């Protein structure tokens, strides 16, 4: 476990994204912090922007099969990411294309923004190599901000309904539970980065919140 901030912000999930053994991180991060993040998550840091923006956690996501980025990502950015990840990089088309915000994925499935068009669903399925299900969590359509998943569990927005939890469990083939980060913040994805190896969370996250993260995502022996 690592508590962290990016330039004073506890919303670490906005500025970094762990995808299998690759960690995309905003390019102005301190090298020592980047190394600490990578060590905790079992991932190799790649300092990059997506579409020229530092909010790489909001604009990219993926799993062991591929990386999905916003349509705003440049060819150079996509090429660097593809080389580092050694897998396919897909570009999420359409108006709703902040991939990290609108796609919640692990190695078993993807749970996505309910308004994504068919073209986007096809791209997600082909890039990530998993079934894709539309839905929301706690009436939040940007499901990538509302939850964080690994291959053990998915921690969801505290107002997620029982039917939403059941839907995301079926989509990702893992157990779901409710939680918060950063002293009660409901948008889990904005303040938590997780892999199967470890997790990084915003500095303001409390002990009870850490306990729920560890229980849900499988970090308690």
UniProtKB/Swiss-Prot annotation:
Which Gene3D superfamilies did the record assign?
L-arginine/glycine Amidinotransferase, Chain A (3.75.10.10)
Matches recorded under SMART domains: eIF6
Q: Where is the signal peptide?
A: none
InterPro entries, from UniProt? eIF6 (IPR002769)
Please report a single Pfam family linked to this protein: eIF-6
Keywords on record: Initiation factor, Protein biosynthesis
Any one GO MF annotation of this record: translation initiation factor activity
- Biological process annotations from GO: cytosolic ribosome assembly
Protein family per UniProt: Belongs to the eIF-6 family.
Matching HAMAP family, A to Z? eIF_6
Function, in words: Binds to the 50S ribosomal subunit and prevents its association with the 30S ribosomal subunit to form the 70S initiation complex.
Name used for this protein in its record: Translation initiation factor 6
| Native species | Halorubrum lacusprofundi (strain ATCC 49239 / DSM 5036 / JCM 8891 / ACAM 34)
């Amino acid at each position: 476990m690592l508590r962290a901030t990016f330039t004073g912000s506890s919303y670490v999930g906005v500025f970094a994204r762990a995808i299998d053994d690759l960690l995309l991180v905003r390019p102005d991060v301190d090298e020592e912090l980047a190394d600490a993040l990578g060590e905790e998550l079992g991932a190799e840091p790649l300092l990059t922007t997506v579409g020229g923006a530092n909010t790489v956690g909001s604009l990219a996501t993926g799993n062991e099969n591929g990386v999905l980025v916003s349509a705003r990502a440049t060819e150079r950015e996509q090429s660097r990411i593809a080389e580092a990840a050694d897998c396919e990089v897909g570009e999420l088309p359409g108006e709703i294309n902040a991939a990290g915000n609108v796609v919640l994925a692990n190695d078993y499935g993807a749970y996505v923004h309910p308004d994504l068009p068919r073209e986007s669903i096809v791209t997600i399925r082909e890039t990530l190599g998993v079934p894709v299900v539309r839905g929301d969590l706690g009436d939040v359509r940007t499901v990538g901000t509302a939850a964080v998943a690994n291959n053990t569990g998915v921690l969801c927005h505290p107002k997620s309904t029982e039917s939403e939890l059941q839907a995301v469990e079926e989509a990702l083939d893992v157990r779901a539970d409710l939680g918060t980060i950063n002293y009660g913040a409901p948008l889990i994805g904005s303040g938590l980065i997780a892999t199967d190896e470890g997790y990084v969370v915003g500095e303001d996250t409390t002990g009870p919140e850490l306990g729920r993260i560890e229980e849900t995502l499988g970090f308690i022996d």
